[in-house]
From Swiss-Prot:
Record-given protein name: Glutamate decarboxylase-like protein FG08083
Keywords: Decarboxylase, Lyase, Pyridoxal phosphate
Gene Ontology CC annotations of this record: cytoplasm
S-S pairs: none
Function: Glutamate decarboxylase-like protein; part of the gene cluster that mediates the biosynthesis of butenolide, a mycotoxin that shows antibiotic activity but does not seem to play a major role in the spread of head blight in wheat. Butenolide is derived from glutamic acid via a 4-acetamido-2-butenoic acid intermediate.
Keyword Membrane: no
Organism, scientific name: Gibberella zeae (strain ATCC MYA-4620 / CBS 123657 / FGSC 9075 / NRRL 31084 / PH-1) (Wheat head blight fungus)
Length: 520
């Protein structure tokens, strides 16, 4: 057998093993509203046998089969209807196929000549997403990034290098700039400030209202106070679909403040961004047109396989100016010069331009963004997977309306769950159904009281929450819990595009039965 035929046979054989092994291990076809997500009972010794050392001679097909069998039986089945704990779901069928397709092609996404067709797909898909998010700039577009945290990080780096262009050459002076984030924002936003050299003292946390959204009035006060303290606003970060309760910040109000004070306006829409596909839900992101950058993860609510994430921007020239470095051995796109000075050098200069950076002449030194094809020059990466292809094929397969229906199903199931929880005497719903996106947060109403037990209410709630969490997971469900500000830890159930009303009715019934059996 020649090498080509041998390789094809080898790939086919291994893929058949993957298919049969995962089908046996996961319980996605039994028709039950929940499926067992539990791991193997005693896997540790077998893990050690498998991962302790590599063999001198390869184990071939049999070793591969044994390994994936063990791994799959000790992995979480997120295709199970009972998987309601994390902000991700079963990967879509076209997504799985496209993931395999990308692995077979194995094209790098750093320069066009390494993957010409897939580069064109990334540019096209990013532009279509930017339009869907109502980014209206003539140079709007985006690039893929290796996750939502990476998107938030790159947005902050771009903000630093564009709002304060001298920082790309000299760094930032401690205490000169401030960033503003909600106290309900994802931790990666604050972490990004540390990575780019701002430090914790530069992070100003804005209080959230009772519904979990950023208080725009408090933001204005915080910006005013920072100015009095001698700090310039570098970036204001809003959230569309917060991690805990799915809150959507008022983008129109926050964006207006950001534009007025000259701050970069970033929106973390990693979880909630899928609403832009739905005419019924896209109002939740009213004001997105004001954003300078938006982080969006199709691998969350849309069900595109991990990792598929984008950083969308209103002006692609900002990505080029912020991230471009001289690497002529790799990037062959023409970099125009003005008066003999490269655009990179020009972007490193200081001047009065930074006060009106959205209309800065520095942006005009960037090349025509439609002609930028070496996409790594727009990012902080070099080697890049063509993850946009997964979104492209997923979108092509389902269409905008099909994606919208799945997003709407997740929200409908969550609101139905919220109503069930609200109406049951043993539960206390934290956020009302009309405030719910795709997560539902609630307490168990305990028979115990602080007077009876000597515990605080927060201690009682946290103890009950953990007991229910452990018990329901032992019954095959995957849920989660989170800390409350005053009343202790609460249960959190995250619905996804596959969650049905039948499933949430079932888990409510089993939680009630469990809580009463435990005497909580």
């Amino acid at each position: 057998m020649d090498n080509g035929l041998s390789r094809r046979h080898e790939i086919s054989e291994l893929l058949q093993l993957v298919d049969s092994t995962t089908t046996r291990a996961f319980h996605t076809s039994n028709g039950s509203p929940k499926s067992d997500c539990r791991n193997d009972s005693k896997p540790l010794k077998r893990y050690e046998e498998l991962f302790g050392s590599f063999p001198a001679e390869g184990l071939g097909t049999s070793g591969f089969k044994d390994a994936i069998d063990l791994i799959s039986r000790n992995s979480v089945d997120n295709a199970s209807p009972g998987f309601l704990g994390k902000l991700v779901s079963a990967p879509s069928a076209p997504g799985i196929a496209s993931d395999l397709f990308l692995s077979i092609l194995n094209n790098n996404g750093h320069v066009q000549r390494a993957g010409p067709a897939l580069t064109a797909i990334e540019k096209h898909t990013s532009l279509e997403l930017a339009r869907l998010f109502d980014l209206q700039g003539p140079h709007a577009g985006g690039v893929t990034v290796p996750g939502g945290a990476a998107g938030n990080l790159m947005a902050m780096l771009v903000a630093r290098n564009i709002v304060a262009p001298e920082s790309k050459q000299r760094g930032l002076t401690p205490g000169e700039y401030a960033i503003f984030v909600s106290d309900a924002a994802h931790y990666s936003v604050s972490n990004s400030a540390n990575v780019i050299g701002l430090g914790n003292d530069s992070i100003i946390r804005v209080p959230a209202l009772d519904d979990g959204t950023m208080d725009a009035d408090a933001l204005q006060r915080a910006v005013d106070q920072a100015g009095k303290d001698g700090k310039k606003p570098l970036l204001i970060a809003a959230t569309s679909g917060s991690t805990v309760n799915g809150a959507f910040d008022p983008l129109d109000k926050i964006g207006e403040i950001a534009h007025r004070v000259g701050a970069w306006f970033h929106v973390d829409a990693c979880w909630g961004g899928g609403v832009v596909f739905s005419d019924k839900l896209k109002h939740l992101m009213k004001g997105s047109h004001l954003a300078d950058s938006i982080a969006f993860n199709p691998h969350k609510l849309l069900g595109v396989p991990l990792v598929c994430a984008f950083l969308l921007v209103n002006d692609l020239r900002t990505l080029w100016l912020a991230n471009k470095l001289n690497a002529g051995y790799l990037f062959h796109d023409d970099a125009p010069k003005k008066n003999g000075v490269s655009s990179e050098q020009s972007a490193n200069t200081n001047g009065s331009e930074k006060e009106s950076w959205r209309h800065s002449k520095l942006l005009d030194t960037a090349p025509d963004v439609m002609k930028i094809n070496d996409l790594a020059s727009l990012t902080i990466q070099c080697s890049r997977r063509h993850d946009a292809t997964k979104m492209f094929l997923h979108w092509l397969y389902y269409g905008t309306a099909g994606i919208a229906r799945e997003v709407e199903q997740a929200v409908d199931s969550a609101k139905h769950l919220a109503c069930l929880v609200r109406d049951h005497p043993r539960f206390e719903l934290i956020w009302d159904p009309e405030q719910v996106f795709a997560q539902v947060c609630f307490y168990w109403k305990s028979a115990s009281t602080p007077e009876k037990s000597g515990e605080t209410l927060a201690e009682i709630n946290s103890r009950n929450t953990r007991a229910l969490f452990q018990g329901i997971e032992e019954m095959g469900w995957k849920v989660d819990f989170a800390p409350g500000k005053a009343k202790g830890e609460f249960l959190r159930i995250a619905c996804n595009r596959l969650t049905t009303r039948q499933t949430v009715e079932k888990i409510v019934s089993e939680l009630v039965e469990l809580g009463e059996s435990l005497g909580l």
